[in-house]
Structure formats: structure tokens, C-alpha cells
């Protein structure tokens, strides 16, 4: 399916149109989407991605459709992993809930532009350098190793992100205010026009998007060398990311084994790329520059492995004791924060509802085994937050 210029143009117009409609209908007017809205919008974008896959079957055949769906599933799984980092960034900078949609839409648009650039660079490398698959495979194996290490997960903490080079440079050279002004990027403070912290958040999100492209793009080229399919799969997986954030932000902490599943997927694709590179080897110091007989892994087999790994990872996360512990702590943290954020004029019924939910989460934590309750680096902060919420409750009574 060597897509023609017309097909490329129509696809780009479709994607741009979907982003514009999403902005006009759901982002331009500042609001927090309800669960029902998030479900409907997420289902809509997934449905569009599936319809595109059906179109690939009709016009390109089943083999190309399998390649597309394998790329789409892989990039969607990696995008869910991106949401962990987005959540950390948004939480660490204290972005108001009403402004989060604009941050996410910017991140998606920026990611689409940068990843498109990476896609064409990757395609050029594959076309002109015989050893490109060795490079891509090595990158994926390194990324898989980083995801599999517990320390790789710890690098996502808020302070690490805030200390990143991009944020430190922006904070130093850009005049920013200390407070947010709704979802505006600029405000006036002391008769001076300044940028709000929302711009720093967007810079942080954009910077992390660039880093994530280093594992997602090689992974997709490990499944297909069709540039058009790689672009389409990337675009459709990113388009639904904003809705997915609001749909599963309460479940992200529960997916405790997702990174390990992604490590397996990236490692598998990395090995697949290495095998393909050996099969077409032309490097003089490897087997005298001659191809090496290897096992061929089909795209259908790759798609099967991806689906099985994601199913096992998700099931293990939701049914494990560690997953239940993470969920209980996340709920307690969320309700404690929600209670502390209540306005002093909030109705008593609403206060009681949130505090009752907080007490239920605390009771669930108390029923957990000690080894799951005592998590280094999280326990002290959570206990402090809970104490503040109880103190606020006592002060209001």
C-alpha cells in the first residue's frame, strides 16, 4: 500500500479536521469532561481508528491491515504509558483541572508533529543505511531494559521532571508568574505581562513527547516498513489520548505491571528487528558481510504476542494484591486532595460525600498487608495529606 499523494493529503486533512472538531466541541469551552463524555469520545476515536483499519483491508488487503492494527495497538499501549508521565507533570505543577484539557491537546498536537518528523527520518535511515535495523533494535532493547528496572519507574517522579534541562532553561529565561490564570498562557502581574506556569507545563509535556518518540517510532518500524501505516497508526493512537486521560486517570496507578508488559513488547520487537537485520546483513564484520539464516517472525505472530502480553499485564495489575494496594492509595490521595480543594462555601452534602469516600479508602488501606501499605517514598507524603484533610474536616465542624 504505497499511498499516493492524494491519499496522504486526505489522511492529513482528516486528522487535522478531527483535531479541530475536538478543540471546538470539547476544549475551547473550559470544562472538565464527565465520565460519560470521556467514554463516548474515547469510543468515537477508537471507532474511527477501527474504521480506518477496515478501509486498509478493503483497499490494501488483510496483510497490511494486520500491520496497521499491530502498530496501532503497540502505539496505543505506549501512549497509555505516556499518560503516567502526563499525570505526574500535571500533578506536580498543580495544573487546575479546568486547564488540563488545553495542556493535553497541545501535547498531542506537538507529539504528532515531532513524531511525523521522526517517522520520515526513520524511513530515510532504513532506505539508505543497511544497519538501521541494528540501531533500532538496540534502541528498543535498551528502552525495554530501562522499563523493566524498578529504578526506571522511579525516574518519573515530579522532582526529576521539574529538574529537567528543558524546564530549568524555560524557567530561567522566560518571565513566568507564580499563579495560574485559568487556562490562559499569559497574565498581567504588577503591571507586567508575564507567562503563566501553564506554558512551563506545555514545555514539559512537549519535551517528554520527544523522548517517548525514541521508543515508539523504532517499535512501529519493527512491525512494518510502510511509512504511511506507521504515520496513520501514530496519529490515530494520539488523537484519542486526551479523552483516554480523563477516562482512566483514576486507574493509571492500578496498572502496576504495565511498564513490565511494555518492556516485553519492546524487547520482542527489538529482537525481531535484530533478526531481520541479520537476515539482510551486509555489515562486513558480521558473517563476512553475508546474510545470516534466522527465524522469521510474521506480523500476525507479532500482533498475537502484543495482544497476549497486554491482556496478561492488565489482568495481573487488576487482580494482584499490589494492584489493589496502589488503587486504594490512589483513591485516598485523590479524595484527600479533593477535600482540601473544596471552597469554603461548598455545601455540606458535597463535603460529607467526599469525606465519606476518603474514609472508605482509608479503611481499605488498613485491611492491606503491611508490605503493601508501607511503600518507600509514598507513605510519608500520603500520611501528611490525610492528616491535613482530617484537620480541615475538624476545623470545618
Curated annotation (Swiss-Prot):
Pfam families assigned to the protein according to its UniProt record, in alphabetical order: TerC (PF03741)
GO cellular component: plasma membrane
Entry membrane topology: Multi-pass membrane protein
Family per similarity comment: Belongs to the TerC family.
Signal peptide extent: none
InterPro entries attached to this UniProt entry: Integral_membrane_TerC (IPR005496), Integral_membrane_TerC_rswitch (IPR022369)
Keyword Cell membrane: yes
Keywords linked to the UniProt accession: Cell membrane, Membrane, Transmembrane, Transmembrane helix
Location(s) in or outside the cell: Cell membrane
Membrane-crossing residue ranges in chain numbering: 1-21, 39-59, 76-96, 103-123, 124-144, 194-214, 219-239, 255-275, 301-321
Statement: the UniProt record of this protein carries the keyword Transmembrane: yes
The protein's name: Uncharacterized membrane protein MT2795
Amino acid at each position: 500500500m504505497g499511498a499516493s499523494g492524494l491519499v496522504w493529503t486526505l489522511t492529513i486533512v482528516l486528522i487535522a479536521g478531527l483535531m479541530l472538531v475536538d478543540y471546538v466541541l470539547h476544549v475551547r469551552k473550559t470544562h472538565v469532561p464527565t465520565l460519560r463524555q470521556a467514554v463516548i469520545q474515547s469510543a468515537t476515536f477508537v471507532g474511527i481508528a477501527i474504521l480506518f483499519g477496515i478501509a486498509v483491508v478493503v483497499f490494501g488487503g488483510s496483510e497490511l491491515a494486520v500491520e496497521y492494527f499491530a502498530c496501532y495497538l503497540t502505539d496505543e499501549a505506549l501512549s497509555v504509558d505516556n499518560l503516567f508521565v502526563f499525570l505526574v507533570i500535571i500533578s506536580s505543577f498543580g495544573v487546575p483541572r479546568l486547564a488540563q484539557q488545553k495542556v493535553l491537546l497541545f501535547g498531542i498536537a506537538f507529539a504528532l508533529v515531532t513524531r511525523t518528523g521522526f517517522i520520515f527520518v526513520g524511513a530515510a535511515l532504513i532506505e539508505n543505511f543497511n544497519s538501521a535495523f541494528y540501531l533500532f533494535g538496540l534502541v528498543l532493547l535498551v528502552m525495554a531494559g530501562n522499563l523493566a528496572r524498578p529504578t526506571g519507574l522511579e525516574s518519573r517522579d515530579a522532582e526529576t521532571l521539574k529538574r529537567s534541562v528543558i524546564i530549568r532553561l524555560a524557567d530561567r529565561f522566560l518571565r513566568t508568574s507564580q499563579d495560574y490564570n485559568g487556562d490562559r498562557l499569559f497574565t498581567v502581574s504588577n503591571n507586567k505581562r508575564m507567562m503563566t506556569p501553564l506554558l512551563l507545563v506545555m514545555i514539559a509535556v512537549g519535551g517528554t513527547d520527544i523522548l517517548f518518540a525514541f521508543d515508539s517510532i523504532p517499535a512501529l518500524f519493527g512491525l512494518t516498513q510502510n511509512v504511511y501505516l506507521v504515520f496513520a497508526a501514530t496519529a490515530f493512537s494520539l488523537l484519542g489520548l486526551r479523552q483516554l486521560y480523563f477516562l482512566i486517570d483514576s486507574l493509571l496507578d492500578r496498572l502496576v505491571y504495565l511498564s513490565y508488559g511494555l518492556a516485553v513488547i519492546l524487547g520482542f520487537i527489538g529482537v525481531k528487528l535484530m533478526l531481520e537485520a541479520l537476515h539482510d546483513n551486509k555489515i562486513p564484520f558480521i558473517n563476512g558481510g553475508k546474510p545470516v539464516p534466522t527465524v522469521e517472525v510474521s506480523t500476525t505472530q507479532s500482533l498475537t504476542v502484543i495482544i497476549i502480553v497486554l491482556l496478561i499485564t492488565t489482568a495481573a495489575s487488576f487482580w494482584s494484591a499490589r494492584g489493589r494496594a496502589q488503587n486504594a492509595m490512589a483513591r485516598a490521595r485523590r479524595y484527600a486532595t479533593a477535600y482540601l480543594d473544596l471552597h469554603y462555601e461548598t455545601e455540606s452534602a458535597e463535603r460529607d460525600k467526599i469525606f465519606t469516600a476518603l474514609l472508605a479508602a482509608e479503611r481499605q488501606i488498613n485491611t492491606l498487608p503491611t508490605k503493601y501499605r508501607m511503600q518507600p517514598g509514598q507513605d510519608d507524603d500520603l500520611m501528611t495529606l490525610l492528616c491535613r484533610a482530617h484537620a480541615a474536616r475538624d476545623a470545618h465542624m
